[in-house]
């Protein structure tokens, strides 16, 4: 039978022996943990125990189940733990077990006390004599090593790593001491805080303040105002912008593309790139393109670099402006032959077909 209990009164050891009594058992093992009077040179007056009762009892019952699954011959198991203040020389925990043979009883009690210290949520506080402050103590059994998230055993794969404290200067972005770096961080935080405060004053603080009030003591928290905007759930002003021109109005303006073509045609007539061409044909053609694209011309620069700049400019314009497709439309040159026009087939009525057939018959008879 399992006897598990948390008590606030002194534990009666004689009562524990009565719970272990059994005619079929030849051995009983009892562990009694008491309060000692010193710790690292400091005099201990008492120990104070606290526990999460429901969870502690649940874990103590699990320990009993583990003992019975490990040692099948156990008859009775007793786990008593005291809560509250426990003076020196008084029992704080008692773990006992009875079995037909001594090996099961001794081993099970040793295993149980280790599991109790590791798993059961019971906390101990040592109260010292004199001016020494009391301390909460942690059981060394409860300190669990940190497990790696990965299942790889790094200890089985030793490797030598040469540690070097010399970092190349090319990899260091900020070359200042700790004091200067801390100063920069503080200045950055203060500046962002001032920006937030000023924005809060603009958004939340009432602009109508009487003259008798001290403006230095006013703030958005004490003199805030909430003005609900019309047809809105927010007190902040919301503005809607209607773009009268641009790519967003293409659907609302059916003649937008025609107007754009006229505008770009008038613009093209204002400038004549051929006036700025030089004697060198490749250079003059590239210079005309650069002038048309709004790029600065550098004749001493490599021609491939200039072509690359023109390509980058084209990609940029195509990405930011939908109207740029106007430039990408290829118009047929005057030197090229015009594509043949598709001829539309004439449709005939039934009377016309009958007259045409009759004319063919008359011609065949005459021949």
Swiss-Prot record:
GO terms for biological process: chromatin remodeling; Mo-molybdopterin cofactor biosynthetic process; molybdopterin cofactor biosynthetic process. Coiled coil: none annotated. Keywords: Cytoplasm, Molybdenum cofactor biosynthesis, Nucleus, Transferase. GO terms for molecular function: molybdopterin synthase activity. Pathway: Cofactor biosynthesis; molybdopterin biosynthesis. Its EC number is 2.8.1.12. It catalyses: 2 [molybdopterin-synthase sulfur-carrier protein]-C-terminal-Gly-aminoethanethioate + cyclic pyranopterin phosphate + H2O = molybdopterin + 2 [molybdopterin-synthase sulfur-carrier protein]-C-terminal Gly-Gly + 2 H(+). It is found in: Cytoplasm; Nucleus. Substrate binds at residues 101-102, 117, 124-126. Residues 325-350 are annotated as: Disordered. InterPro entries: MoaE_sf, MOCS2B_euk, Mopterin_biosynth_MoaE. SUPFAM superfamilies: Molybdopterin synthase subunit MoaE. This protein is produced by a bicistronic gene which also produces the small subunit (Mocs2A). Catalytic subunit of the molybdopterin synthase complex, a complex that catalyzes the conversion of precursor Z into molybdopterin. Acts by mediating the incorporation of 2 sulfur atoms from thiocarboxylated Mocs2A into precursor Z to generate a dithiolene group. Involved during biosynthesis of the molybdenum cofactor. Heterotetramer; composed of 2 small (Mocs2A) and 2 large (Mocs2B) subunits. Component of the Ada2a-containing (ATAC) complex composed of at least Ada2a, Atac1, Hcf, Ada3, Gcn5, Mocs2B, Charac-14, Atac3, Atac2, NC2beta and wds. This is Molybdopterin synthase catalytic subunit.
